[in-house]
Regions:
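Bacterial Sec-exported substrate-binding components of ABC uptake systems
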Residues: 4, 22-105, 216-234
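N-terminal export leaders
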Residues: 5-9
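A short, structured surface patch at a secondary-structure boundary
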Residues: 57-156, 162-168
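Extracytoplasmic substrate-binding proteins
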Residues: 96, 153, 157-234
Length: 234
């Protein structure tokens, strides 16, 4: 059974899930599986994902139409003893990413996070972004096969921490299932389904949460919004 967002909050193994102040002070990781909901991460335009923040620094990313939930845990956080069904835990730092969704690369570049990507689903000559092309030509990022025919051996050897796919993966569901059987979480990117340029750009906040770069993501988004908004009003 897949949990709704509300059901997930109720299912967390906490004595009580209560709203705490948004400015709760960070605390050292405790040896506990309790998660206390703190606040919903504010999104101005995006509707294809939500983010719920917890007092220990964890964030639950939900992509409803992909039926996916990712609980991003801070580096050094205690291992949870109980995780609700349908939730994938991602422990920071999220590294050695297999990036298949080409549209996400620009957001990674804005976050100065090219070094978090180890594998690409696009060959060097297929990239329209010079930084990505150069990273592949220099060997910093390796080609690991397209979405429908990944090089599983290379992906496993690279100790891939996350595969970022686009919705084309649904044409070959067996590939997604195989990656997950190998223990590789698969995030299906849906920014292209947003209704406006600003909503698509706001996906930078999702990647900021994944990579521990929330402040930079907010800064970049604000700058881009200020630049784009006047053009949209014309």
């Amino acid at each position: 059974m897949k949990l709704t967002r509300a059901q997930f909050l109720k299912a967390l193994p906490a004595a009580a899930l209560v709203l705490a102040g948004c400015a709760a002070a960070p605390t050292a990781p405790a040896d506990t599986d309790e998660l206390v909901f703190d606040h919903a991460y504010p999104l101005d335009y995006a509707t294809q994902f939500t983010a719920d923040c917890y007092a220990d620094g964890s964030t639950l990313l939900t992509i409803p139409d992909a039926q996916a939930k990712f609980l991003v845990r801070p580096e050094g956080a205690a291992t949870l003893r109980t995780v609700p069904d349908g939730v994938t835990v991602l422990q920071q730092p999220v590294q050695n990413i297999y990036l298949v969704s080409t549209s996400a690369m620009d957001l990674f570049l804005h976050l100065d996070a090219l070094d978090s990507i180890a594998l690409s689903g696009t060959r060097a000559e297929g990239w329209y972004l010079d930084e990505a092309k150069q990273a592949m030509q220099s060997g910093r990022i390796a080609y690991a096969g397209k979405y429908s025919a990944p090089d599983y051996e290379r992906i496993l050897t690279a100790e891939c921490g996350l595969a970022v796919e686009n919705t084309m993966i649904y044409h070959t569901p067996e590939v997604k299932e195989q990656l997950e059987r190998f223990g590789i979480p698969v995030l299906v990117e849906r920014s292209s389904y947003e209704s406006s340029p600003l909503a698509r750009m706001e996906w930078i906040k999702l990647y900021g949460i994944l990579l521990g770069k929330e402040a930079l993501a907010e800064e970049v988004f604000t700058q881009q919004a200020q630049r784009i908004a006047p053009l949209l009003e014309q």
